[in-house]
């Protein structure tokens, strides 16, 4: 299963925000410069993260973005569920001759459940914990 670039950038953004001191604001330009992402794309990502309650946005000259809840409460699995279309096949959308005897759908459902269960064990905080190399890469100049 491949995550969309939207989810990839959302996870990177959450990791970066979690690396900052508690309640410290950053801005979209800083995030786009760090990850080399277009501003337009990142605005959409951050808006969606805000709608979902992951990111708090502050408007105005001294505004910015920060995590809305502790990184220890944000699981990678939760973010993926919120952002990804998780249907691996389009069973039921179109007629398929083998549907009555097909076992693939159940196998794919089990694989998806195992994938998400693994990601549910991982919080944004755990990705930073004891990871000094990552913290150095994320540090502001």
From Swiss-Prot:
GO BP, one annotated term: negative regulation of DNA-templated transcription
One Gene Ontology cellular component annotation held by this UniProt entry: cytosol
Keyword Transcription regulation set for record: yes
DNA-binding region: 28-51
Ranges of residues in domain HTH rrf2-type: 2-129
Bound cofactor: record note: Binds 1 [2Fe-2S] cluster per subunit.
GO molecular function ontology, one term from the record: iron ion binding
Binding residues annotated for [2Fe-2S] cluster, in chain numbering: 91, 96, 102
Cofactor(s) the protein needs: [2Fe-2S] cluster
Keywords in alphabetical order: 2Fe-2S, DNA-binding, Iron, Iron-sulfur, Metal-binding, Repressor, Transcription, Transcription regulation
Flavoprotein is among the record's keywords: no
PANTHER family for the chain: HTH-TYPE TRANSCRIPTIONAL REPRESSOR NSRR, WINGED HELIX-TURN-HELIX TRANSCRIPTIONAL REGULATOR, RRF2 FAMILY
Function comment: Nitric oxide-sensitive repressor of genes involved in protecting the cell against nitrosative stress. May require iron for activity.
Protein name: HTH-type transcriptional repressor NsrR
The organism of origin for this protein: Vibrio parahaemolyticus serotype O3:K6 (strain RIMD 2210633)
């Amino acid at each position: 299963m491949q995550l969309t670039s939207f989810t990839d950038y959302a996870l990177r953004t959450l990791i970066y925000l979690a690396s900052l001191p508690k309640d410290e604001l950053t801005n979209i330009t800083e995030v786009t410069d760090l990850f080399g992402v277009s501003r337009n794309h990142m605005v959409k990502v951050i808006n969606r993260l805000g709608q979902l309650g992951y990111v708090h946005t502050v408007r105005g000259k001294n505004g910015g973005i920060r995590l809305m809840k502790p990184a220890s409460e944000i699981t990678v699995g939760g973010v993926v569920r919120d952002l990804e279309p998780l249907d691996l096949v389009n069973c039921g959308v179109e007629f398929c001759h083998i549907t009555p005897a097909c076992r693939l759908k159940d196998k794919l459902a089990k694989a998806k459940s195992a994938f998400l269960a693994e990601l549910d064990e991982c919080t944004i905080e755990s990705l930073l914990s004891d990871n000094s190399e990552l913290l150095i890469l994320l540090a502001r100049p």
